[in-house]
Amino acid sequence: SFREKVFSEEERSYCESTANPEVHYATRFAAKEAVLKALGTGFSRGIANHDVEVRRNAKGRPFVVLHGRAKEVADEQGVRELPLSLSYTHTDAVACALAITEESVRAQEERVNPMEELAKQFKEARSLLDEMDAPKKASEDPAN
């Protein structure tokens, strides 16, 4: 069946345990598509439906488990994390996934915090002004 081709045993078991299985199947399918778009592949490059699996942690939060070719592609791209957000109504399902790579994490860590940079520049400017003002104060000092 379509469900067996597309969804893992765990995904099917979860969806079938809900009051509206169709909505949960649709949401998981949207999640698979979102993950593959985040990887830049879609269902191509040898990636099968079962290569992307949506599971839930102990608190019910969805997370992605990659298998087969999808895992290989993610590893090739240096994907470190794939956060996933799912939402649905009675008639619509939406999923958003983001592929966070080692490179993007490194770039974020190297990025300068604008507030820290401004504070640093202010201190440097203050120090320069104090140095410029020091000779003037020395000449005005009656002890000199």
Question: Where are these predicted regions, by residue range?
Answer:
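Core catalytic alpha/beta fold that binds nucleotide/phospho-ligands
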Residues: 1-144
